[in-house]
Amino acid sequence: MTVRKELLNNIRIVDPYVPGEQPRQKVVKLNTNENPYPPAPEVKAVFDELKEDEFRLYPDPTSGKLIKALADQLKVGEDQIFVGVGSDDVLSLCFLTFFNSEKPILFPDITYSFYQVWANLYRIPYVCPKLDGKFRIVKEDYYKVNGGIIFPNPNAPTAIYEEVDFIEDILRHNRDNIVIIDEAYVDF
């Protein structure tokens, strides 16, 4: 197969990401982390104190100050923090880095739609276990042989949050597999 045909085949299998509805009227979309309120006075004060150069020059590529602040807040080591250009960037890197086995990765059938896009783009086989009748993840479906697991917590778009014991059960049954819990909306 020629490189051109190979590329065309890869492009054909990738479904483009379709963002959520973009209403024209003035609507605050909570599902995309929009906020109806202005920044807190403390946040506004920080922005007001920034120098012009801090906005127009490329930021610190190591994100040192941010990593330190996050590590302090989360009470973890700085080496346990990874910073990217938004959660989509971080997740894309996770797919490329961790999901490279011939075994299929697992993610729910109703979930963040970009997981399927990345899996197709990076040619990662996947299986999507169905949610139960109450739109919850069935943890036992994630106990089988797999090439890794990813799911959001809370799940998108169901907004159902799974407690630590649920996640620990999945981890116990996947000691030799990568399990990624996507918490992009955990504070939402």
Question: Where do the PLM segments sit?
Answer:
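N-terminal "arm"/small-domain region of PLP-dependent enzymes with the aminotransferase-like
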Residues: 1-57, 145
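Conserved core of the PLP fold type I
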Residues: 55-175, 180, 185-188
